[in-house]
Amino acid sequence: MLIRPAGSEYAAQDVIYKLESNIDDTTGEALGYVMERLLAAGARDVQYSPVYMKKNRPAYLLTVLCLEEDIPALEEIIFAETTTIGIRRVRMERSILKRHIYTIPTSLGDVEVKMCLVPHCNGNEVFEDVEERCYPEYESIKAICKRTGRSYQDVTRQVLRELAENKED
């Protein structure tokens, strides 16, 4: 799907940085701790991917998305908490959908919902009809699950069903 970036009422241009590093000689617990520290220090997203390095050594590729001003603090954490000896840095432009978070009443209680508007596009032409996508926020669903004892999938399905029914009204 091609979305008209700058100037669109539905999407905006953004700049984000990607920090990457290969990490071996570590434990899953250490990687989990590093992820927690990076997210607490401002990382927008953190992920690990399994990779093989030279001499077929298994390792992890650490990928961190962040704003430019957060790079020094995040690199300091990566160097202090991992066995890496280098960090790659890439500046990336991206298009992101505009979104809003609403608190919606449901039969299970109030749920925070992220709403995105996705224009139907054909090349550079943006049509008037727009798809509305709703994503219940994790913390809201988790709180309902803890309170009711129901599964995450069950609660999410019910919330989405109620959102769709209310949209039709």
Cite the ranges covered by each PLM segment.
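Mobile "lid/hinge" segments at catalytic clefts and subdomain interfaces of large enzymes
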Residues: 1-7
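Long, contiguous binding/interaction regions
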Residues: 8, 14-65, 69-86, 91-169
